[in-house]
Amino acid sequence: MSRQAAPRWVVGEGRGTLGGAATMLRSLLLHSLRLCSQTASCLVLFPRFLGTAFMLWLLDFLCIRKHLLGRRRRGQPEIEVELNSDGEEVPPDDPPVCVSDDNRLCTLASLRAVWHGQKLDFFKQAHEGGPAPNSEVVLPDGFQNQHILDYARGNRPLVLNFGSCTUPPFMARMSAFQRLVTKYQRDVDFLIIYIEEAHPSDGWVTTDSPYSIPQHRSLEDRVSAARVLQQGAPECALVLDTMTNSSSSAYGAYFERLYIIQSGTIMYQGGRGPDGYQVSEVRTWLERYDEQLHGPQPRRV
């Protein structure tokens, strides 16, 4: 009788099949966890988003808009008058946010921008008292890649200012920020990070924006927009966010935001713009820091 040949096993064949199955299972598990995380974040963010959307819808009624914005201005504390070296009155650090009557606030483009900003804020890595994310930035000259903490020198504080030319509060308060640069640059470093446009001409358009700039499609577009800003802030270092918006994502910086970093730690985290973007809070922090270094200085009123 002929003997049947015994089955031959190829060494490693079963191991390779099991390895491939394990890789697929691991990938499926990671995708499932990511999906669950995104779903949970949407459930957390959705009530907040709905509240913002409802407020924008209300503000499209001009009578409500004028009443609410007027009441907000009246509720603000009286601004202390500051004089420059020539005895002239210095404009306030945080002029009130103005919204023209012809601007619609509750549109599909505005809701997309609001959702994008709230999502970045929810997933940001930066938190006050925690380590500062060393996210990637790009030099406008030569497109050389660097990192944010490359601009931190020793124990000196580093002030980060995120924004874009089409953001009215950011541009309205640039002169106040520039005054801080001039006054404290001996002991403090400052860095402007140009991020995606807040109100691009092909997105959420506002007539209050001083410039009409479309959303950036390339680094060249972002450089062109940043050059406009650089003319108004010649004394401050300026870099670009990457086209993947790595710095804006890490710091939750859209529409605009302020941070202070010292020794790799976030010492101050400003609120999200427009309402939370307060140059006066940075000034207060720097005044306290300056007093620690040099003692209290007399203030002229």
Swiss-Prot record:
Reaction catalyzed: 3,3',5'-triiodo-L-thyronine + iodide + A + H(+) = L-thyroxine + AH2; 3,3'-diiodo-L-thyronine + iodide + A + H(+) = 3,3',5-triiodo-L-thyronine + AH2; 3-iodo-L-thyronine + iodide + A + H(+) = 3,5-diiodo-L-thyronine + AH2; L-thyronine + iodide + A + H(+) = 3-iodo-L-thyronine + AH2
Secretion signal span: none
Q: What is this protein called?
A: Thyroxine 5-deiodinase
Task: Offer one Pfam family short name for this entry.
Answer: T4_deiodinase
Q: Where in the cell is it found?
A: Cell membrane; Endosome membrane
Species the sequence originates in: Bos taurus (Bovine)
Q: Which family does it belong to?
A: Belongs to the iodothyronine deiodinase family.
The major lineage groups are: Eukaryota, Metazoa, Chordata, Craniata, Vertebrata
In this entry, the parts of the chain located on the Extracellular side of the membrane are 65-301
Q: Which residues lie on this side of the membrane: Cytoplasmic?
A: 1-41
The membrane topology noted for this protein in its Swiss-Prot or TrEMBL record is:
Single-pass type II membrane protein
**PROSITE patterns reported in the protein's UniProt record:** T4_DEIODINASE
Q: What class of enzyme is it?
A: oxidoreductase
Keywords of the record, alphabetical order, are:
Cell membrane, Endosome, Membrane, Oxidoreductase, Selenocysteine, Signal-anchor, Thyroid hormones biosynthesis, Transmembrane, Transmembrane helix
